[in-house]
């Protein structure tokens, strides 16, 4: 078999396995949502009131990640996708956690994101000599100042609309420019980051389920238990990532 045929088979197997992972993930997510809908419907009514805040936080994250991609065009694509996935999910969970005053969820999420981002960046910094250049720091500082000016000078509704438009623009541009490149540059080894995406999503799903649990005085103990479980799970996944 020619090399081109082997590459096509590898791509097909990779896509098949990733879609299987996504399908399992969706089944788990729908099962949990159905359970919460049947058992705790009043919690879902509270969740709808925080949708606008969550979307605003997501769009701010997308703008920041778009800036990262512009400032560091040579940054590894699979690392960028993992960081995008991690940051967007964590911002949504944390924003809702603040809305519901679930401190244990927020503490667990901060620990999870910190550990995962550290492992992701450290692996590539030491193994592939990825260097974050000065343009990233300059661009990030400029973006922070612009966001501060937008939220200070404009009313709340206007600033949210501007952030949403900027986030959507980044999404559309990224999809149009990168879809063909991603399809042609798929490697079978990228299955490991895909599996890690599923692992992270299941962990975030576990943290999100804590929203539907009643607040108790022992929330500090719950936070310590969740953080400890997060540390152990992340440490167990790190050898797979490095390999």
Curated annotation (Swiss-Prot):
Annotated Gene Ontology cellular component terms: host cell membrane; membrane
InterPro entries (alphabetical): Bax_inhibitor_1-related
Pfam families: Bax1-I
Spans through the membrane: 20-40, 47-67, 80-100, 106-126, 143-163, 164-184, 192-212
Alphabetical keyword list: Host membrane, Membrane, Transmembrane, Transmembrane helix
PANTHER family named in the record: BAX INHIBITOR-RELATED, PROTEIN LIFEGUARD 4
Name of the protein: Membrane protein US21
Species per Swiss-Prot/TrEMBL record: Human cytomegalovirus (strain Merlin) (HHV-5)
